[in-house]
Amino acid sequence: MAEQQPTFQQAMEITAAWLQQWENEEISDEVLADRIGEMVSSRDGARGFFVVSLAGDSALMDRLPDAVVGQLRAAGSGVVDLSVRNLAMSTAMAVTHGRSGDSAQQAGSQRVSSRCSELLRQLEPALVKERLEQLLEATVDNTGADVAFLEKWGYDAEQRVAISKSVYDVADD
């Protein structure tokens, strides 16, 4: 009998518990990595994992253990896609928060964006390059598959410029 995949909400709750155990040194990098590998094998699981790990206070995404990087790389294009989308969304939200003068929220969005950039540098280079080029095509030329994504969230010209800059920043470092 196949294991039931977690819902998005369950994935967030499970991830938060795992990260707390990891922070408290109750589980090893390797055990955490195995659990993350299972979690990111489904779209909802991966979404829940990234919401908690990218936006939360855990240091995991700031100092990714090799075992975790290996599991995230092995997950392939699904993890790359979510990481690129999170890069775009957090970058656009940093612009929004900057406009409204909410420096705390802006800093949080910038932290997520930085974490996404660093993660993307450690994932499979060919997949990352292809996915970033697709996003760039939409932000710069308003063509390709990501135009609908940008329009869905209502990103304006300033946000699209910031997103394209964040794409180039991934490649520069």
Predicted regions and their residues:
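Low-complexity intrinsically disordered segments
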Residues: 1-26, 127-173
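Alpha-solenoid helical-repeat scaffolds
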Residues: 5, 9, 26, 40, ...
